[in-house]
Each structure stands twice: as structure tokens, then as C-alpha cells.
């Protein structure tokens, strides 16, 4: 049954991990810089958008009250 199966040695696991890491295509430095810039610009855009929205709603509530 399940107890009868031999367990794979630890080095077999690490060899598998290394093998899979070698198959992975890693982004280049330029790609990382490009994607990081896109993320930062997007975050800043939404920061400004929601800040302006918050100010607008605050002023609207102030006018109503």
C-alpha cells in the first residue's frame, strides 16, 4: 500500500527544483525596469485619482451639511 512505497531522497527533490529553475525564463533587467515603471506610474495615477475623488466627495458633503 502507501506505506510500502519508498520515499524519494532529499537530493532528488533539490535536483528537481534546480531543473525547474533552469527551465524558467527570467525577465531581463530592461523588462524589470519597464514593468516596475508601469506599476509605479499606475499606482501614482490611482493615488491622485482617489485623492481627488475623496476631496470632491468631502466638499460635496460639506456643501450638503
Swiss-Prot record:
Gene3D superfamilies the record matches: Preprotein translocase secy subunit
Alphabetical list of InterPro entries matching this protein: SecE_bac (IPR005807), SecE_sf (IPR038379), Translocase_SecE/Sec61-g (IPR001901)
Membrane topology recorded in Swiss-Prot or TrEMBL: Single-pass membrane protein
Keyword annotations: Cell membrane, Membrane, Protein transport, Translocation, Transmembrane, Transmembrane helix, Transport
Organism: Staphylococcus carnosus (strain TM300)
Segments crossing the lipid bilayer: 38-58
Compartments in which it is found: Cell membrane
GO cellular component: plasma membrane
Subunit details: Component of the Sec protein translocase complex. Heterotrimer consisting of SecY, SecE and SecG subunits. The heterotrimers can form oligomers, although 1 heterotrimer is thought to be able to translocate proteins. Interacts with the ribosome. Interacts with SecDF, and other proteins may be involved. Interacts with SecA.
Protein name: Protein translocase subunit SecE
Gene Ontology biological-process annotations: intracellular protein transmembrane transport; protein secretion; protein targeting; protein transport by the Sec complex
Pfam families membership: SecE
Family (UniProt): Belongs to the SecE/SEC61-gamma family.
Xref: HAMAP family: SecE
Coiled-coil segments on the chain, per record: none
Amino acid at each position: 500500500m502507501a506505506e510500502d512505497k519508498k520515499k524519494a531522497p532529499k537530493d532528488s527533490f533539490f535536483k528537481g527544483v534546480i531543473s525547474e529553475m533552469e527551465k524558467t525564463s527570467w525577465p531581463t533587467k530592461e523588462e524589470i525596469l519597464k514593468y516596475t515603471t508601469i506599476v509605479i506610474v499606475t499606482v501614482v495615477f490611482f493615488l491622485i485619482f482617489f485623492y481627488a475623488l475623496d476631496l470632491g466627495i468631502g466638499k460635496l458633503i460639506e456643501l450638503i451639511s
